[in-house]
């Protein structure tokens, strides 16, 4: 599978062609991997597969609230901020302008993974960070915790954030008071002044917040020295990558469609666009250069924290999925809520993202079930509704219409080809394809790199 089709770069056109309108711009196409549910679908595994022959792997949104796990040579690496494709020594990793960066978190993550195995050796020389990416400060994280506490006290429930400062830093960005990587590396005196103003704003909003401004600035100066060689103009970097020699460029989405700030189950969402539009805005590239868009789907559904979950099984079935699937959040360690596959939500995610193919992961977790249910429609007041209610109170009231399929009651973890799967497992996959009208390209039947069955 080729990542990138190549068209002649504008600079290579003869002068006589300058005035002629061109139907499509030239350049390489990026391959995008996106979560199609509420996260934790196994995106890291798909990225790891595709990154083996990639040249550049990018992150375009989110921060270290995301959690991707990749297993290579029996070593389990955990990624939160770094693109997980960085474990390929030939890959250049790029963190785009749409990502928010907590510098202590970045270095801590890199050091932890360096100690685990050889995958991250020389990572500093292979990482490029957009100069337009915003910085998450410790007080953003502290404010995140205070906000959650206030929500709990005032409304009796919180949003279930990871307390990584993601909401507050995107709020600073939208309020135009945030600070970016370019500010840190270009003019530390100017950066310091703006940092003091922002810190004092936060102290006035949250009186209990303690900020050691001088101490923080001292730490940030140390990080500035380390990070400076990695910071570049991201727009120019990516333009050169798209319009230079053929390159395989991969974009690794964080979070997932139903956590998108606009299209997710608001307000129980993240603070960035984790759908395909976030690729263009978070990297600074035109939509014409988006190639394949792969949606990653778990064979059942999980969700961390609170919020609507129509197919949730708060019973023995949910418990069995939770224990068999070892469903704990990579970032928070929280137990994930579990339920049947929801095709209504997947159709909605496809409407927004236009998936060209799917990766269906964790099919082996369903091995124990004699019958498997799949959500195929929503009813409200006894009537089938053709859409997903945007309002959470209404979404909580929908009744799911299920299709029941026979299980396979067989261990499929050693299957390495589609034809090696039991007929009922094959039928489950084909049913999903037929309902969604999207081909399934990969099927995951275990944790290792080898346990991804490729269909075409």
Curated annotation (Swiss-Prot):
Its cofactor is Mg(2+). Substrate binds at residues 40, 330-336. IMP binds at residues 40-43, 65-68, 162, 176, 255, 270, 334. One of its GO terms (cellular component) is cytosol. It is an enzyme of class 6 (ligase). Inhibited competitively by AMP and IMP and non-competitively by fructose 1,6-bisphosphate. Pathway: Purine metabolism; AMP biosynthesis via de novo pathway; AMP from IMP: step 1/2. The active site is at 40 (proton acceptor), 68 (proton donor). Its main location: cytoplasm. GTP binds at residues 39-45, 67-69, 336, 362-364, 444-447. Coiled coil: none annotated. Its EC number is 6.3.4.4. PROSITE patterns: ADENYLOSUCCIN_SYN_1, ADENYLOSUCCIN_SYN_2. Binds 1 Mg(2+) ion per subunit. Keywords: Cytoplasm, GTP-binding, Ligase, Magnesium, Metal-binding, Mitochondrion, Nucleotide-binding, Purine biosynthesis. GO terms for molecular function: adenylosuccinate synthase activity; GTP binding; magnesium ion binding; phosphate ion binding. It catalyses: IMP + L-aspartate + GTP = N(6)-(1,2-dicarboxyethyl)-AMP + GDP + phosphate + 2 H(+). Plays an important role in the de novo pathway and in the salvage pathway of purine nucleotide biosynthesis. Catalyzes the first committed step in the biosynthesis of AMP from IMP. Belongs to the adenylosuccinate synthetase family. Homodimer. HAMAP family: Adenylosucc_synth (MF_00011), Adenylosucc_synth_vert_acid (MF_03127). This is Adenylosuccinate synthetase isozyme 2. The lineage of its organism: Eukaryota, Metazoa, Chordata, Craniata, Vertebrata.
């Amino acid at each position: 599978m080729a990542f990138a089709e190549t068209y002649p770069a504008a600079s290579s056109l003869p002068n006589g062609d300058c005035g002629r309108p061109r139907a499509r711009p030239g350049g390489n196409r990026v391959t995008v991997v996106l979560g199609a549910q509420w996260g934790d679908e196994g995106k890291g595994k798909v990225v790891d597969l595709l990154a083996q022959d990639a040249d550049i792997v990018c992150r375009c949104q989110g921060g270290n609230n995301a959690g991707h796990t990749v297993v290579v040579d029996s070593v389990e690496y955990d990624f939160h901020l770094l693109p997980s494709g960085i474990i390929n020594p030939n890959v250049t990793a790029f963190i785009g302008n749409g990502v928010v960066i907590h510098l202590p978190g970045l270095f801590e993550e890199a050091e932890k993974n360096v100690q685990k195995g050889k995958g991250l050796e020389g990572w500093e020389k292979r990482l490029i960070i957009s100069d337009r990416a915003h910085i998450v400060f410790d007080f953003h994280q502290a404010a995140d915790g205070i906000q959650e506490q206030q929500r709990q006290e005032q409304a009796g429930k919180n949003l279930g954030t990871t307390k990584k400062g993601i909401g507050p830093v995107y709020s600073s960005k939208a309020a135009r008071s945030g600070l970016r990587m370019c500010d840190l590396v270009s003019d530390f005196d100017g950066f310091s002044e703006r940092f003091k103003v922002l810190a004092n704003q936060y102290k006035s909003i949250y009186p209990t917040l303690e900020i050691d401004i001088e101490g923080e600035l001292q730490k940030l100066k140390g990080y500035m020295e380390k990070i400076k060689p990695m910071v570049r103009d991201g727009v120019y970097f990516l333009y050169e990558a798209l319009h230079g020699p053929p390159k395989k460029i991969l974009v690794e989405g964080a979070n997932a469609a139903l956590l998108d700030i606009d299209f997710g189950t608001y307000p129980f969402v993240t603070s960035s666009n984790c759908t395909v539009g976030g690729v263009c805005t978070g990297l600074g590239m035109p939509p014409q250069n988006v190639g394949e868009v792969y949606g990653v789907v778990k064979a059942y559904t999980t969700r961390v924290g609170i919020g609507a979950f129509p197919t949730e099984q708060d019973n023995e079935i949910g418990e069995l999925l939770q224990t068999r699937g070892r469903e704990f959040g990579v970032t928070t360690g929280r137990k994930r809520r579990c339920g049947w596959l929801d095709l209504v939500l997947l159709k909605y995610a496809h409407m927004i993202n236009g998936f060209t193919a799917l990766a269906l992961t964790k099919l082996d977790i369903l091995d124990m079930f004699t019958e498997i249910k799949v959500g195929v429609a929503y009813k409200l007041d006894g009537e089938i509704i053709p859409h997903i209610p945007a309002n959470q109170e209404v979404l909580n009231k929908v009744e799911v219409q299920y299709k029941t399929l026979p299980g396979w009651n067989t261990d499929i973890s050693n299957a390495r080809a589609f034809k090696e799967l039991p007929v009922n497992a094959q039928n489950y996959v084909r049913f999903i394809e037929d309902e969604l009208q999207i081909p399934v390209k990969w099927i995951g039947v275990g944790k290792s790199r080898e346990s991804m069955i490729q269909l075409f």
